[in-house]
Amino acid sequence: MMLLDLEEKTRVLIEDIVERSAIGSGSIFVLGLSSSEVIGGIIGKASSREIGQRIVKTILEVLEPKGIYLAVQGCEHLNRALVVERELALAKDLEIVNVLPTLHAGGSGQLAAFDYMEDPVEVEEILAQAGIDIGDTSIGMHVKRVQVPLRPIISELGGAHVTALASRPKLIGGARAEYLADPIRKN
């Protein structure tokens, strides 16, 4: 996959997921990324710093003008901690942890987040409103309930399977209750 094609497909994916998940300024968007899978390898075995940089930079170019924060999930070697802007961590009172990602502990996406964010820190956990999983990294633990699967308009990025999640408030009250319109499914 050519790098410009990778950037364009990433941009299309993120713009589509942001629109369909109905998130806006102040929201958090989580990224799970296996650059190994993108280049056709096995998750965690062929990490590519350049692929991570291209994807994260492109995602930030889409999210930042909309006021949406990016949280980049690390691998299980870092207990799936996330890189976020310090501003977000302090505003949301997130638990900051002391670790610096490497290519094989945290991964290429986290390294890229440290390259492109203004004041990046690692946090232990987060509850994002939506997210994208590039390479079956399992982002579900970081997306708030109730999670709504979104079928991405592009199902693979390079060799990586792509899935996405949005979230909506819980519906409570049962048969007698009335609800606001669902902005994700647009009932």
Swiss-Prot record:
Protein's name in the database: UPF0340 protein str1894
Q: Which organism is it from?
A: Streptococcus thermophilus (strain CNRZ 1066)
NCBIfam families this protein is in? TIGR01440 family protein
| Pfam families per the UniProt record, alphabetical | DUF436
Domain of life of the source: Bacteria
Alphabetized Gene3D superfamilies for the sequence: Hypothetical protein TT1679
- List the cysteine pairs that form cystine: none
Tell me the protein family, please: Belongs to the UPF0340 family.
Q: HAMAP family annotated for this entry?
A: UPF0340
